[in-house]
Amino acid sequence: MLAKRIIPCLDVRNGQVVKGVQFRNHEIIGDIVPLAQRYAQEGADELVFYDITASSDGRVVDKSWVSRVAEVIDIPFCVAGGIKSVEEAGQILSFGADKISINSPALADPELITRLADRYGVQCIVVGIDTWHDATTGRYHVNQYTGDEARTKVTTWETLDWVEEVQKRGAGEIVLNMMNQDGVRNGYDLHQLNLVRDVCNVPLIASGGAGTMEHFLDAFQTAHVDGALAASVFHKQIINIGELKQYLKQQGVEIRVC
């Protein structure tokens, strides 16, 4: 069995790490490189960096910090933000990223997933999905351009359909960003994760809602995800990654402990 992964998420805007609640009202957390170093030292399995306004601003991720991160950490990291071409992805990988993630650009051009997978291999192509639960209809819908709340829009895709579509096109991994849960720290949406797990045959990463160590355990044992991504509990030092991994190991979760 592959070890489960603990993945800190660093949302980047204007060269700094920020964090919002339900993708709104972002506050500055700190500088990118020191945070990346701290998480690597604490025992993170990998890091994810989202340049959150790149797609809504119509630009590609700022590559200046990618190489600086690559110089100081020795764990894999994934970069996302406005990547719309094979060439742009190649640049980011050449700067030292191990994976690239696409979200809004894939919704605008689904064939981009296939072009990237064909060129670089499915193992380094991640598709991020920003999913919103509509309490009125009970349905889960995919949102686009979520880095800017003024430009965020609901797409015509329902979440489960989009999960199946991106796999057909070559996604090697899916990060499910559950917007309703984001930043509120009351647990991952296990019901939604189980629905997605049933149709997802590639590694699935849960994102949005972690507030306690038990929430990570629930995601692994109840929803059978491959990795759990979190931000605010790590940024605010509510949970230490090393202690979290020791707890999960004690609960029988297969996990890499430093």
From Swiss-Prot:
Pathway involvement of the protein, from the record: Amino-acid biosynthesis; L-histidine biosynthesis; L-histidine from 5-phospho-alpha-D-ribose 1-diphosphate: step 5/9
Protein's name according to its UniProt entry: Imidazole glycerol phosphate synthase subunit HisF
Gene name as annotated: hisF
Subunit structure, as described in the record: Heterodimer of HisH and HisF.
Family the entry assigns: Belongs to the HisA/HisF family.
Keywords recorded for this protein, A-Z: Amino-acid biosynthesis, Cytoplasm, Histidine biosynthesis, Lyase
Enzyme class: lyase
Record CDD domains: HisF
InterPro entries: Aldolase_TIM, His_biosynth, HisF, IGPS_HisA/HisF, RibuloseP-bd_barrel
Source organism superkingdom: Bacteria
